[in-house]
């Protein structure tokens, strides 16, 4: 089946699809606080979703392209779930968030098919994959159109990987008690087995969102990167996120001695946002299998246990948390009680001495991850490093922070 035909088949209208902002029906909605964060973007009046320009640009999207798609959404006069929120157009049609970003992705998909130069074609496929992922953002459970966009993103990513430098292998991992999961192993040029970083991504991202991290930071150092989706999304959608948040990643770690391209004696974990919750759990529970753990903007305690901190978080992010936990109809109070159980301090891990070297990077006044969380991580480690990343200039400091983190990982792996 051609890519064009696949797109037509997946998005063929069958029934009135639920609109993304209606999927989580929490009560006690409060006033929306203005929020700005390097990793999550910022709240903009009249938008349900946080607009995450830094990360989208970092993944290769032109700022003008972002504005063009936003303009098409704003200009639509189609019916909306909430007339005050631009990105709540109902149905797969002009003005709908998923429709507009997927339409933009199809433009790059067509460019990729028409391009004769393999590397340039690969770049176009990667661009399309990223746009499909933005279409599916924030990846709420039960969002049928978003899941179809994710399927197209994965297809485009596989096409890109065949044409871009290095090697990518799609791998299946068995997890007892449930469905197997699929991961992507990205390998640099040269002969393996390679030192490898196991990526633990944020809850509002897909595993295919981290190619830039591999290409710009790990591959030049001869380090491979292995990704899997977080529980309840993408290839891990059949698994619910539980208090044992590191379950899937633990089974992947245990399988690495059987993967010939990975040097299982030289493995580190890198966690973004809630992915740091997974990575730090691994540092405690699987320390013999890990040389190091690095975290960026970790969500390990405060956001999960502090009501005041939760009040500062946008509705969309609370919806993401509720969706991952399978609490689509929960009150804020019920969600708060459940989130507290995910705190690694409440679980009795953080605060205990951990033999695994751990680095944690943070931004001052980050509403999702205060400095205290990073200090808690690094002070618990026998070899801890605290890294403050200045906010402005945001893109340059983000790059500088990642260079420092990957250099720290390299010293412990190579």
UniProtKB/Swiss-Prot annotation:
Whether Mitochondrion counts among this entry's keywords is: no
- Kindly state which keywords UniProt assigns to this record, in alphabetical order: Hydrolase, Serine esterase
Query: Which top class of enzyme applies to this chain?
Result: hydrolase
Q: Name one GO molecular function term.
A: carboxylesterase activity
Q: Which Gene3D superfamilies match?
A: alpha/beta hydrolase
- From the UniProt record, list the reaction(s) this protein catalyses: a carboxylic ester + H2O = an alcohol + a carboxylate + H(+)
Q: What is its EC number?
A: 3.1.1.1
Its family remark reads:
Belongs to the FrsA family.
Per its database record, what is this protein's job? Catalyzes the hydrolysis of esters.
Q: Supply the HAMAP family for this chain.
A: FrsA (MF_01063)
- Protein name from the UniProt record: Esterase FrsA
Give the originating organism. Answer: Escherichia coli O9:H4 (strain HS)
Q: What taxonomic lineage is listed for the species of origin? A: Bacteria, Pseudomonadati, Pseudomonadota, Gammaproteobacteria, Enterobacterales
């Amino acid at each position: 089946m051609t890519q064009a035909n696949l797109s037509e088949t997946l998005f063929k209208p069958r029934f009135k699809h639920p609109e993304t902002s209606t999927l989580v029906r929490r009560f006690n909605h409060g006033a929306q606080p203005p929020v700005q964060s390097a990793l999550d973007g910022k709240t903009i009046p009249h938008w349900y979703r946080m607009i995450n320009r830094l990360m989208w640009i970092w993944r290769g999207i032109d700022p003008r392209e972002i504005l063009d798609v936003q303009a098409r959404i704003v200009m639509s006069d189609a019916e909306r779930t909430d007339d005050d929120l631009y990105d709540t157009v109902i149905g797969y049609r002009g003005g709908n968030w998923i429709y507009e970003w997927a339409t933009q992705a199809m433009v790059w998909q067509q460019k990729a098919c028409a391009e004769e130069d393999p590397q340039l074609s690969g770049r176009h496929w990667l661009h399309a994959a990223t746009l499909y992922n933005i279409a599916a953002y924030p990846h709420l459970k039960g969002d049928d159109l978003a899941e179809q966009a994710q399927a197209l993103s994965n297809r485009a990513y596989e096409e890109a990987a065949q044409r871009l430098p290095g090697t990518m292998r799609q791998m299946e991992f068995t997890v007892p008690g449930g469905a197997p999961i699929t991961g992507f192993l990205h390998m640099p040029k040269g002969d393996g087995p390679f030192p490898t970083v196991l990526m633990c991504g944020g809850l509002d991202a897909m595993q295919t969102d981290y190619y830039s991290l591999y290409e710009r930071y790990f591959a030049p150092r001869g380090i491979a990167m292995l990704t899997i989706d977080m529980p309840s999304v993408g290839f891990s959608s059949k698994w619910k996120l539980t208090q044992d948040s590191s379950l899937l990643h633990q089974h992947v770690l245990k399988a690495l001695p059987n993967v010939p391209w990975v040097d299982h004696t030289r493995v580190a974990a890198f966690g973004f946002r809630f992915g740091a919750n997974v990575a730090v759990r691994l540092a405690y529970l699987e320390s013999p299998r890990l040389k190091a753990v690095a975290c960026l903007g970790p969500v390990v305690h405060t956001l999960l246990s502090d009501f005041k901190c939760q009040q500062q978080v946008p509705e969309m992010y609370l919806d993401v948390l509720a969706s991952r936990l399978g609490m689509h109809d929960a009150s804020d109070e019920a969600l708060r009680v459940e989130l507290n159980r995910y705190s690694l301090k409440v679980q009795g891990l953080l605060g205990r001495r951990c033999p695994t070297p751990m680095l944690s990077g943070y931004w001052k006044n980050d509403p999702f991850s205060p400095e205290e969380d990073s200090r808690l991580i690094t002070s618990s480690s026998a070899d801890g490093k605290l890294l403050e990343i200045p906010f402005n200039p945001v893109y340059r400091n983000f790059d500088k922070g990642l260079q420092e983190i990957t250099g720290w990982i390299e010293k412990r792996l190579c």
